[in-house]
A protein has these predicted regions:
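Beta-loop-alpha module in the N-terminal Rossmann-like domain of NAD(P)-dependent dehydrogenases
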Residues: 62, 72-135
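N-terminal Rossmann-like dinucleotide-binding module
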Residues: 17-71
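Hydrophobic h-region of N-terminal signal peptides that target proteins for export
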Residues: 10-17
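Rossmann-fold dehydrogenase core element
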Residues: 131-149, 171
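C-terminal helix-rich "cap/oligomerization" subdomain common to oxidoreductases
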Residues: 19-22, 92-94, 322-366
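Predominantly a Rossmann-like dinucleotide-binding segment in NAD(P)-dependent oxidoreductases
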Residues: 36, 150-240, 358
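Contiguous beta-strand/loop segments that form the cofactor/metal-binding neighborhood of enzyme cores
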Residues: 213-292, 318-328, 350-351, 364
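C-terminal glycine/acidic-rich active-site capping loop/insertion
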Residues: 184, 272-343, 361
Length: 366
């Protein structure tokens, strides 16, 4: 019995030794700084889940400007992606280059087994997307796409109501996205130079903001591909955007539902909201947190506030880290998934084709 106190002293040490050690932060490289959404990762509060180990950006002046703004060392900056990957050996790369450049990022990362998260949309066209998909599958990497609206609690509340059958079968989705225009809101020229060029972005507002609606409607419809696409684009401000559209409406037809995507650089204010109508009820996501719901037994809309998303489902880089570390399962039906975003690119390419020809385009595309 004299040894009992000593044994009791050892118990906490034994229990501590059995506990798994905390996982180290995921080593992340940043491919490009020319997409203004890069401030999301550069200005992110420290959460201990990722560590930026390198940045690939040939524009030294831009890198220095952002280094001063966010306080990172220029020692992290490399002139190109290949040199950054070789020197820093990241586990994952976040692509904030041009949309056209997403393929190049995957071509460099996939053979090295490096996971990739691109900023929306996945690819500039279906040809690029299919090459990226093939590389991701061949080398068994994650290929994720980030959208701001993925992290809106309001959108997830609407989806829950739809999935629970509270609204009845979905009949119509109306999704509004955009702002006054990238030049009007003061986007830097390193961003607008490629954003307003069809080669590097694939189009104008139809791509920049049409992708949100394509992503959300595919998610709400549980991965179902539309049967046809009809789109109309306009150049309301050709003096500002001579190469691309600044106004787009895309109609997605499903066997028993319809989605109307209103993508614009002409809204009088910035907006990312949607209306979902079921057979017997409706739910509107007004912004990131607010929504209003009309249930079958009600004659009016009831305002609601969505609960905040819990980690790691509240942040793109937390999600990326959790998937790389395999602390959460991969969901092929999610907003970030490759499966969803292959359909998104197909919708966008069909929309561009429809707008150019004035004809309805049927899916799947060849």
């Amino acid at each position: 019995m004299k040894s009992l106190p000593f044994t009791l002293m050892l118990l906490p040490l034994c229990m501590l030794a059995q506990q798994p050690s905390p996982k180290p932060p995921v080593r992340v490289g940043v491919a490009g700084l020319v997409h203004t959404h890069v401030h999301w990762i550069l200005g992110r509060a420290e959460r201990g889940d990722i560590e930026i180990v390198g940045i690939a950006e040939p524009n030294r002046e831009l890198a220095e400007r952002y280094a001063k703004q966010h306080g990172f060392s220029m020692d992290l900056v490399y002139p190109d992606l290949e040199s950054m990957l070789e020197a820093t050996k990241p586990e994952a790369v976040t692509a904030f280059n041009t949309i056209y450049g997403h393929l190049e990022a995957v071509e460099a990362c996939a053979p090295r087994g490096i996971h990739v998260m691109v900023e929306k949309p996945l690819a500039v066209n279906l040809e690029h997307a299919r090459k990226m998909e093939s590389l991701a599958q061949e080398h068994n990497i994650l290929l994720l796409t980030n959208y701001e609206t993925t992290w809106y609690g309001s959108n997830h509340k609407v989806k829950s109501l739809a999935d629970e059958g509270v609204l009845g079968p979905i009949r119509k989705m109306v999704i509004h996205d955009g702002h006054e225009g990238p030049i009007e809101i003061g986007c830097n020229p390193e961003f607008t130079d490629w954003l307003c060029d069809p080669k590097w972005n694939g189009g104008g507002a139809i791509i920049d903001f049409g992708c949100y609606g394509a992503n959300l409607s595919t998610w709400l419809m549980k991965g179902e591909r539309p049967t046809s696409i009809f789109a109309v684009t306009q150049q309301i401000k050709p003096h500002l955007y001579p190469k691309v559209d600044d106004e787009a409406t895309i109609v997605l037809t499903y066997p028993e539902a319809q989605a109307i995507i209103q993508a614009s650089w002409n809204w009088p204010y910035s907006r990312k909201d949607m209306e979902v109508y079921g057979k017997s009820g409706a739910a509107f996501a007004l912004d990131a947190t607010r929504l209003k719901v009309r249930l079958p037994e009600s004659a009016t809309f009831e305002p609601q506030t969505a609960t905040a998303r819990t980690a790691p489902y509240d942040d793109p880089f937390a999600l990326l880290a959790a998937l790389v570390r395999k602390t959460i399962p991969y969901d092929k039906m999610s907003l970030s998934s490759l499966e969803n975003n292959m359909i998104v690119v197909e919708i966008l390419q069909a929309a561009v084709q429809s707008a150019e020809t004035g004809k309805r385009v049927y899916l799947p595309l060849d």
